[in-house]
């Protein structure tokens, strides 16, 4: 057996043998400007709050036209790396959790429209909120429990007003998401509910009170378990609630489809 010769792996003949024909991806000038500016920002050549050079200076520096500079700055803004106000030079900013989630929003909404998309997001919400209620039952302060109780009061006062009830319903779950004090949790939760609510079917007026009251009673069960600092019961109550909500949504969606 011949000895291993590593030089043969990098020889032109070996490389040519392993190559497969594929087109080179040509980058737009704006993408090249964007990448270079992003690297400069991440290397902290510009500090947070500092202004970038003017568009004209960037055009001269990169030897590109104004459209390329503006497209690059717009892309950096979407990433949360710069803020752009009319009449001012772009200013360096720090990406927030909201910015990161916002970048995913379009893809998430597109995914929801595909078969099985809603079910996958429902499972994500169930796993996520299950951890939240367990944490809340173990760690919620008296002030946080009082805030959760306030959202229940709004729940009870809006059973006949669907728009108001949805708002108080979201507030209840949002307070839960805020208990750990992690801004990423909050951003994920806000986005997740926004995506799911956008796909939520309408409830008939005749069924509105019963539908909302069911959710309200289930919220009470979750709250009572958290107040007793019982994570297992809080988790069971949350699972019952969300599974009930999901089943209701699927029933309403099926009815809506059959009516079309």
UniProtKB/Swiss-Prot annotation:
GO terms for biological process: negative regulation of DNA-templated transcription. One of its GO terms (molecular function) is DNA binding. The keyword Transcription regulation applies. The keyword Repressor applies. InterPro entries: GntR_C, TF_FadR/GntR_C, Tscrpt_reg_HTH_GntR, Tscrpt_reg_NanR, WH-like_DNA-bd_sf, WH_DNA-bd_sf. Pfam families: FCD (PF07729), GntR (PF00392). Residues 55-74 bind DNA. SUPFAM superfamilies: GntR ligand-binding domain-like, Winged helix' DNA-binding domain. Keywords: DNA-binding, Repressor, Transcription, Transcription regulation. Residues 27-95 form the HTH gntR-type domain. Belongs to the NanR family. This is HTH-type transcriptional repressor NanR. It comes from Edwardsiella tarda (strain FL6-60).
